[in-house]
Amino acid sequence: MSDIMNIDSIISRLLEVRGARPGKNVQLSESEIRSLCLKSREIFLSQPILLELEAPLKICGDIHGQYYDLLRLFEYGGFPPESNYLFLGDYVDRGKQSLETICLLLAYKIKYAENFFLLRGNHECASINRIYGFYDECKRRYTIKLWKTFTDCFNCLPVAAIVDEKIFCCHGGLSPDLSSMEQIRRIMRPTDVPDQGLLCDLLWSDPDKDTMGWGENDRGVSFTFGAEVVGKFLQKHEFDLICRAHQVVEDGYEFFAKRQLVTLFSAPNYCGEFDNAGAMMSVDDTLMCSFQILKPADKRRFVYPNFGSSGRPLTPPRGANNKNKKK
């Protein structure tokens, strides 16, 4: 693979725009991007679908194509291999630089396979990113064929991680079908995200303070789950914390169920529509968790397309009144 692809050259070109005007594109060749997809796919399949990781590491939530904010996260937390990372999914869609975002993440995965980890989000799925921006970006800047190559790669991403046997991480949340970790390990890849069931729930479900047990999800997919479900899950599996993403939260992180679950969202000033901060959670060797906050940048400098006006509903912050279906 190294004959075809110089990974250091790719990373260095992707990082060249640091300090440039936000929004400046990095145009890798189509064959380089294809190689990133194929090589990372190989690595994903060689590692478990349920990762078992060790602290210290930094955990990040949704990025959604906000490439310059991803660079800010690395500036804050340390560019790999200075720190170990776990990302919780939703790399593409909504923001205008999904390609740079996913290419840098895949490049780091290839270069630092044992220290840099990516989970699958609900947007790493063809039926979703066909609609919410990634397909259009691939088609405009490259080809539809390249978008299909990304789909093949996304279908092999791991879906959950356990940090030091104590912190359970996934993109969305719990599932009424989940009773043993072995069920996650048995999910075969490559796989699309089904409309229901365990894999769907891990990527789509949401905690909800008004739900007792399991409830209907306003997204029109999966379920909501209450604090009691969280407590029972942690007790049964001897975990201390659930760490998930999937929802915009004002401060970049938000606790639920007496600090037994935390939501992380790492795209500040989401799509230029919200005033939310972004956050990254640092887990030290003793499993102490602390949060690094990215304040929303000056809106005039960060211009993201207003998808709200082109029929692509935004994910509302938790507690917002405007409830959108399937996001």
From Swiss-Prot:
- What InterPro entries does the record point to? Calcineurin-like_PHP_ApaH, Metallo-depent_PP-like, PP1_catalytic_subunit, Ser/Thr-sp_prot-phosphatase, STPPase_N
Provide the residue positions that the database annotates as binding Mn(2+) 2: D90, N122, H171, H246
Q: Which cofactor does it need?
A: Mn(2+)
> Family per UniProt?
Belongs to the PPP phosphatase family. PP-1 subfamily.
Q: What GO terms fall under cellular component here?
A: cytoplasm; cytosol; nucleus; protein phosphatase type 1 complex
For the keyword Secreted, the answer is no
Disulfide bridge partners, by residue number: none
* Stretch list, region Disordered: 308-327
Which PROSITE patterns does the record associate with it? SER_THR_PHOSPHATASE (PS00125)
The first-level EC class reads: hydrolase
Q: Which Pfam families match?
A: Metallophos, STPPase_N
Keyword Manganese set for record:
yes
Tell me the PANTHER family matching this sequence: SERINE/THREONINE PROTEIN PHOSPHATASE (PTHR11668), SERINE_THREONINE-PROTEIN PHOSPHATASE (PTHR11668:SF300)
GO BP of this protein:
defense response to Gram-negative bacterium; negative regulation of BMP signaling pathway; negative regulation of smoothened signaling pathway; positive regulation of canonical Wnt signaling pathway; positive regulation of innate immune response; regulation of glycogen biosynthetic process; regulation of glycogen catabolic process
| Residues modified to Phosphothreonine | T315
EC numbers listed for it are 3.1.3.16
Which reaction is this enzyme known to catalyze? O-phospho-L-seryl-[protein] + H2O = L-seryl-[protein] + phosphate; O-phospho-L-threonyl-[protein] + H2O = L-threonyl-[protein] + phosphate
Q: For Mn(2+) 1, which residues are the binding ones? A: D62, H64, D90
User: What name does UniProt use for this protein?
Assistant: Serine/threonine-protein phosphatase alpha-1 isoform
Instruction: Give the cofactor note text.
Output: Binds 2 manganese ions per subunit.
| A GO molecular-function descriptor | protein serine/threonine phosphatase activity
